[in-house]
Structures are given as C-alpha cells and as structure tokens.
C-alpha cells in the first residue's frame, strides 16, 4: 500500500468512487516513490458533480453575506491549524522544500481566502435616481457553477486563489487539479466541508486535462472557467468555452519575464533579486524573471555575484528543513528542462554554472537539475524566447534604456517584469512602458491577496486576486422601478 493509499473523487460533500476504473499514480519526485493512486473522473462524474454543485449553489447563495463570510473564515482557521500537515503532503507530492511549503503555499493561500471572506459584505449594488417618480438599482448576483483547472506548481495555493473569490461571490466550484499534483486539493475539499460549506459547493475531480478538463470546459451547466497552464492548452480552453455556452474565462498562461538591472542599481540587491526570480521553487514559478538584462559594463561584476550566491543554494531532500532547493515536479519535466539546457549550449550561450542533471548518489533517484546560469545570451535563442519552467537563468547585456525596453517587450508573453534601480523616476518611466501585467520595482515575486495578478498578450486573460476578481465572479442585474403612472404610446 502506498503512503496515502487510493484517493477517490470529492463530490457533494463526500468522497465517492469514480464511475470508471482508471487510476493514475502520484509520484514523489524527490525519490520516485509512488505515494498514492488516484481515481480518474469520467464524463458521467462531471455530470453528477455539476448537478450537485447546482443544488449546493442555491443553498449557498441564499445565505447572508455574513453567514458565508463566517464559514470561509472558519476554513481559514482550519487551514492555519493544519499548516504543517498540509505542507508535508504538498512537499511529498511536488518535491518543493518543506521550508517553502510551510511558509508560503498554505500560508498565502489562506491569506487569499481570508481576504475574500472579508470582502463578501461589500458585494453590493447601486441605487440610481432617474427622475422624481423612477429609479433604478443594480444587484451583483453569482454566476452559478464555475470550474477551476489548476497547475502543478502551486497546487493548494492555486485551488484557493480560484475557489476563494468564486465562493465568496456565492458560486459553487468544480475544481480539477493537475494530474501531477492532486493531493492537497482533495484535502482542501475536506477543510471546506468541515468549516460548514454546504454539500456540492466545492467539488474535486481528479484526472487528465484531455478528459476531465475537456468535459468541464464544454459542459453547458458551467458558467465560467478559471484556468492556469500553458498557452496551447489555454487556447483550447477558450475555444471550448466559447464554442459551448460562451462561458466567461480567466486564464494565466505563463511567462518569459524580463528583469532589468540598471547601472545605478545596488548590484548585491540586484543579484539577490535575480536569484529569487529564477531559483525559488526550483525555478517553477510562472512569474519568474528568467531574462536578466544587465548593462554590458557590469556583466562581469554581476556574474561574479550570481556565481557566489548559487554556491549558497542548499540542495537536497525537500523534507530536510535546511534545504531550500528541491527536485523538479516530475521526471518527464526534468527531461524537458534538460532539453532546453542542451539547446542553450548548442546555440552558443556560455554556461556560467550548472547545466547538468544531478546524478550523484544523493540525487540519483530524484528529478533533480542543477541550478543553471547561462550568459552571453541572445534574444533569438530558444532558452531566451520559450518558457522553460525550471532553474535556468539567462543573462543578456544591453547598452541603453530605449534598447532594453524594446528587447524586454519583444516576447509573446507579458506576465511579469521588474526593474532594479536607485532612480525612482526611471523606475516608473520604464515600468510604464513594459508590456506586463505584474511589475516589481526593487523586489520580485510577492503576490499579496490585495494585488491583481494576470498577464498581457499571450500570458492570459483576466485577473486573479484583488477586488476586481471578486466582481468578475458576479453578473450585474439592473432593475428599474416606476412609482408613477405608466404611459403607453399605444
């Protein structure tokens, strides 16, 4: 028997068996251990989840704002009480260091849920005077049943980012986690039920995007889809959503984000920021600043500072709390990252450090890739143009501000961007010209609940977090009231 056994689907407030027989394995990428088997949902399971969600949503939406708020706040308390337990499960499933999952994944996810729980009472309409005898008012009403489709890099955090505003607005959600990292989403469903969420309001269906994801995005009973993943999959989701019932969509589709270091920057700070923007979570962060632009005159100094910091990375067993760099999420993903590294070598980028799989006995059983820094990179290189989603930094040099802005924007992506400079006038001037939805000045990577997150161009549609996201899980109903006589022209 595997560590976590056989995992069922979660529908209508309880674990239930799939109507099909297919299962798949959850694998710990640190050592290759099969830690669980998960049932694959079928189209019939999607149908029954939609039925359960529609029934539960009516109960949930009929509650007062304060009642819904109290239930979600209880869920926040439970998440925080179980932080360490959930963090260990996330570490086993993703390979992320325990030092990270204990302090980031559940903590920040719970923060988002607490934020939206507090906003529920502010979901209100307007009263609009028209004339002495007539006025109009608006109501913000929930969409109904919505779907969330998660990515594998932040499983429980993404499940909370998607479910928190949806539930706060009075909707029910059917969530499909990535088949690579599904375990904590099921635990989140347990937490919601324990907190008092009505049955059917949060359901979890495990399985592949080709089967479960396809069924969710085309189902006529679903009003909106929130998706995190790649561009190709996002286009399929959008086409399915439009071709079925004109569903609303929110999508975060990754990035190849520029980090611009200016000549007046504190180079130690710039190097620290570049390290966090490339190697946190083993480089598996959508917003990573993987195109690092430095003035040509400072290239050697900057490389020396990066090289010194790479030596301080603590690689190892992710359950060791001293470790801050674990394996990649899966063995197939490791092979993908290694192919990109070989591409960089072939195209003439110089390897400053790393560039190899980690095959020592200590790492041989896991999906480890050494932290890698390429320098002397060109804009046309594959490693510079495509999202690698691994611990690979590309250093590029530039001559002047106009040039670096133009090159930073030369990408199909537009998720994030950042500048490091001592001149705040320049910082704002440059940021205002960068084509990216999330920008940082003299920092990198923080995504607080209050701040909308999303991309320009092919990096996505819509936003997550912030007040605007809550509003987009509602629809506005306008009502006109006539207090006087009605006069017909007929």
Swiss-Prot record:
Known catalytic reactions: betaine aldehyde + NAD(+) + H2O = glycine betaine + NADH + 2 H(+)
Residues annotated as site: Seems to be a necessary countercharge to the potassium cations: 248
EC number of the protein: 1.2.1.8
Necessary cofactors: K(+)
SUPFAM superfamilies listed in its UniProt record: ALDH-like
The protein's annotated pathway: Amine and polyamine biosynthesis; betaine biosynthesis via choline pathway; betaine from betaine aldehyde: step 1/1
Keywords, alphabetical: Metal-binding, NAD, NADP, Oxidation, Oxidoreductase, Potassium
Keyword Metal-binding in record: yes
Cysteine sulfenic acid (-SOH) modifications at: 286
Source domain of life: Bacteria
Residues noted as binding NAD(+) in the record, renumbered to the chain: 150-152, 176-179, 230-233, 254, 286, 387
Gene Ontology molecular function terms on file: betaine-aldehyde dehydrogenase (NAD+) activity; metal ion binding
Binding of K(+) 1, residues: 93, 180
InterPro entries: Ald_DH/histidinol_DH (IPR016161), Ald_DH_C (IPR016163), Ald_DH_CS_CYS (IPR016160), Ald_DH_CS_GLU (IPR029510), Ald_DH_N (IPR016162), Aldehyde_DH_dom (IPR015590), BADH (IPR011264)
UniProt cofactor note: Binds 2 potassium ions per subunit.
Residues the record marks as active site: 162 (charge relay system), 252 (proton acceptor), 286 (nucleophile), 464 (charge relay system)
KW NAD (keyword) present: yes
Family: Belongs to the aldehyde dehydrogenase family.
Description of how the protein assembles with itself and partners: Dimer of dimers.
Stated role: Involved in the biosynthesis of the osmoprotectant glycine betaine. Catalyzes the irreversible oxidation of betaine aldehyde to the corresponding acid.
Name used for this protein in its record: Betaine aldehyde dehydrogenase
Organism expressing this protein natively: Pectobacterium carotovorum subsp. carotovorum (strain PC1)
Upper classification of the organism: Bacteria, Pseudomonadati, Pseudomonadota, Gammaproteobacteria, Enterobacterales
Gene that specifies this protein: betB
